[in-house]
Design a protein with these regions (language model features):
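Acidic donor-binding loop at a coil-to-helix junction in glycosyltransferase catalytic cores
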Residues: 124-130
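Conserved donor NDP-sugar-binding/catalytic core segment of glycosyltransferases
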Residues: 47-80
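Acidic donor-binding segment of Leloir-type glycosyltransferases
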Residues: 1-12
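Catalytic core of nucleotide-sugar-dependent glycosyltransferases
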Residues: 139, 151, 159-184
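Catalytic beta-strand/loop signature of glycosyltransferases that borders the donor
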Residues: 67, 141-148
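Short, flexible, basic/aromatic active-site loop/helix in glycosyltransferases
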Residues: 67, 81-99
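Short aromatic/hydrophobic "clamp" motif used to bind/position activated sugar donors
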Residues: 35
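Glycine-rich, basic loop-to-helix element that forms the pyrophosphate-binding segment
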Residues: 12-30, 51
Length: 218
């Protein structure tokens, strides 16, 4: 019943090729100039799209995100915040080491995404690869200094970011950035060394690192 009232088009893929290539097809299917990312189990603030479209048009931005508030079970009980830089120069510098965007808050211009090569098979880092490619293609970026989404976090998120396989894929993605000249060798080596510690530590330690060291309490 709800499905019939909402003009959502589905484009099922015949074969699971991973998130990056699925997002690539999604971009190609979009019919409008501005595309919004959203995760199914997250909650956008009611005026998220209005605020983002207005700022994108006012400042002629190609890529715009914002901050997130994280919860475990109850969206009204926020446990942490992930705040990101808001100005283009800060974003460009920050993106070389960590993601300068919360992907579930992002809006971007379709033509700039295509100019940057669209999403690729990202080895768990399809968003970071696209952000760097868009910056290299001349995209003007920004982040709203506001909470745009409430995001569910839990043990599953921390488990996915650990283990030898994750570390291997992370290193391969960073190598791709290095070969493209988007990061320096020192940035590559430093990020892989840090990720090695995080990926190989016990799950509860990884959760502590993410929630207490890489997040804000307010």
């Amino acid at each position: 019943e709800a499905e019939s009232d909402i003009p959502v088009k589905r484009y099922p893929l015949e074969q699971n090729q991973g998130l990056g290539l699925a997002l690539r097809q999604g971009v190609l299917q979009c019919q409008y100039d501005i595309i919004a990312r959203m995760d199914t189990d997250d909650i956008a603030v009611p005026d998220r799209f209005e605020k983002q479209v207005q700022l994108m048009e006012k400042n002629k931005l190609d890529l715009l995100g914002g901050h997130i508030a994280e919860f475990i079970d109850n969206p009204d009980e926020i446990v942490s915040y992930r705040r990101v830089p808001t100005q283009h120069a800060e974003i460009v510098a920050y993106q070389r080491m960590r993601s300068a965007f919360n992907h579930m808050t992002v809006m971007f211009k379709k033509d700039m995404v295509l100019k940057a090569g669209n999403y690729e098979d990202g080895l768990y880092m399809e968003d970071d690869l696209l952000w760097l490619n868009m910056i290299a293609a001349g995209a003007k970026t920004g982040n709203l200094d506001q909470i745009l989404c409430k995001v569910r976090v839990g043990a599953g998120m921390f488990e996915r970011r650990g283990g030898l396989r994750y570390l291997k894929l992370y290193r391969q993605a960073r190598q791709r950035m290095l070969k493209r000249g988007q990061i320096s060798y020192m940035e590559y080596a430093k990020s892989v060394a840090i990720q090695m510690v995080v990926a190989l530590c016990p799950g509860f330690v990884r959760q502590f690192i993410f929630m207490k060291l890489l997040r804000k309490s307010k």
